[in-house]
C-alpha cells in the first residue's frame, strides 16, 4: 500500500514538473496575445468580361463591352491594438473590399470599416464598434535585439473560422533598420 502511494505521489510530482516546464515565455506570450488576434473575412467585387475578344480594341470599336461582376471571398489576420476596436491588418487583405467581417476568438463577429490603408508598407487600419476589446499594446521596435525570439499569431487559410483560435509560429529578429527603398 505504501509502495502504491509512493508511485502515485511520484507520478503526480513528475506530472507537475512536466507541466511547469512546458509553461515558458513563448507559451505564456501566446496565451496572453491570442485573445487580441482577429480573423478578417472580406468580400470583394471583381469585374470581368464575358468574352476574351473584348480586350481587342477592334472588337470593342464595334461592340460595347459586356462587363460582369462577381463576389470573391478572401481572408487574413489582424490584431486588435486598442480597447475601442482599432485593428491592424494588411493592406492586401482588405484592398477593394466591399464588406469586411472581423471575428475574434470565441466566435463574436463585427462589421469593420477601413480607417486607413498604406499600400507601400502593406498596412491597413480597421475599426469595429464596441468597447473593452482585448488588445496588444504596440512596443518600440527600436528596442528589439537581433536574434531575439518573436511570435507570429494568425489565421492562415481561414483556419481560425474552423476552431476560433489563431495558429502560432516562432522565429527570430533577423535584422533591423533595413532600407527597402520605401519612401
Map each language-model feature to its residues:
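Sec-dependent N-terminal signal peptides
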Residues: 2-12
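Serine-dependent protease modules
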Residues: 15-183
Amino acid at each position: 500500500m505504501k509502495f502504491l502511494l509512493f508511485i502515485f505521489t511520484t507520478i503526480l510530482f513528475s506530472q507537475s514538473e512536466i507541466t511547469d516546464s512546458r509553461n515558458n515565455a513563448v507559451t505564456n506570450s501566446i496565451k496572453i496575445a491570442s485573445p487580441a488576434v482577429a480573423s478578417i473575412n472580406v468580400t470583394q467585387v471583381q469585374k470581368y468580361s464575358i468574352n476574351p475578344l473584348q480586350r481587342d480594341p477592334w472588337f470593342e470599336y464595334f461592340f460595347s463591352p459586356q462587363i460582369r461582376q462577381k463576389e470573391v471571398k478572401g481572408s487574413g489576420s489582424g490584431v486588435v491594438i486598442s480597447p475601442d476596436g482599432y485593428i491592424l491588418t494588411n493592406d492586401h487583405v482588405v484592398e477593394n473590399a466591399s464588406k469586411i467581417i472581423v471575428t475574434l476568438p470565441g466566435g463574436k463577429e463585427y462589421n469593420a470599416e477601413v480607417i486607413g490603408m498604406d499600400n507601400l508598407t502593406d498596412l491597413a487600419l480597421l475599426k469595429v464598434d464596441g468597447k473593452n476589446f482585448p488588445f496588444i499594446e504596440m512596443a518600440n521596435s527600436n528596442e528589439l535585439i537581433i536574434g531575439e525570439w518573436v511570435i507570429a499569431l494568425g489565421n492562415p487559410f481561414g483556419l481560425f473560422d474552423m476552431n476560433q483560435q489563431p495558429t502560432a509560429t516562432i522565429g527570430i529578429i533577423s535584422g533591423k533598420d533595413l532600407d527597402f527603398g520605401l519612401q
